[in-house]
């Protein structure tokens, strides 16, 4: 849950996170601006294998700064393998990041360009660690897929998620969300960039192998507006909309961004 000590604007916004979470100023923070001319094609990168079982979809939860769609992760029915990963990583949840307007919602940038939103699919190293909580702070603990989202055509594959938001309008609300394969939200091409980074909000652990797809997906402006209709407050409290939840890009600090293509 979002603790009240951090947020996305004012005195608990991203530029102040370092006071309570010193790793915010670490050398391997995310997101980054991917400068395509400085990425290196790595022929040793394997193709990605994404295998999600719709039966593992479990619930949707308003966490106060976004919504999470959570998956049953007690077995290997929904896993990410290959690419830059040497082990099998289990799907835990997916969520989106968005901005106040349609032109600035992504966390990762490409050659300085912002996108409308960004989808993150969160996986943990189930080959080495017993649980997500154990993996989350380990250097090889997490693997996140990032999908950049552009406003354009409506995305029919997102509709089931949007329809479920009504049931979780307020912080801490949860509702069943079953029979969904999130691979329908991925772009047709799985060409990707990969680099070592961090969670993009507190606790900001530098434990993430990032896999960012080159190809974008589209959503309509109306669909994106439904994300902003979610409330950051618990029921009965003063209404505060989740208007934005994206961290600005962080310094690369000499890290290499590999390309699969």
Swiss-Prot record:
Top class in the EC scheme: lyase
EC id: 4.2.1.1, 4.2.1.69
UniProtKB keywords: Acetylation, Cytoplasm, Lyase, Metal-binding, Zinc
Binding site for Zn(2+): 95, 97, 120
Record's keyword annotation contains RNA-binding: no
GO molecular function, one term: carbonate dehydratase activity
Substrates-to-products reaction catalysed: hydrogencarbonate + H(+) = CO2 + H2O; urea = cyanamide + H2O
Cofactor field: Zn(2+)
Cellular compartment(s): Cytoplasm
Activity regulation details: Inhibited by acetazolamide.
Gene3D superfamilies: Alpha carbonic anhydrase
Alpha-carbonic anhydrase domain span: 4-261
Residues that bind substrate: 200-201
Modified residue annotations for N-acetylalanine: 2
Gene Ontology cellular-component annotations: cytoplasm
Keyword Cytoplasm tagged: yes
Active site per database record: 65 (proton donor/acceptor)
Similarity comment text for this entry: Belongs to the alpha-carbonic anhydrase family.
Role description: Catalyzes the reversible hydration of carbon dioxide. Can hydrate cyanamide to urea.
Name under which the protein is recorded: Carbonic anhydrase 1
Record organism: Bos taurus
Gene symbol of the encoding locus: CA1
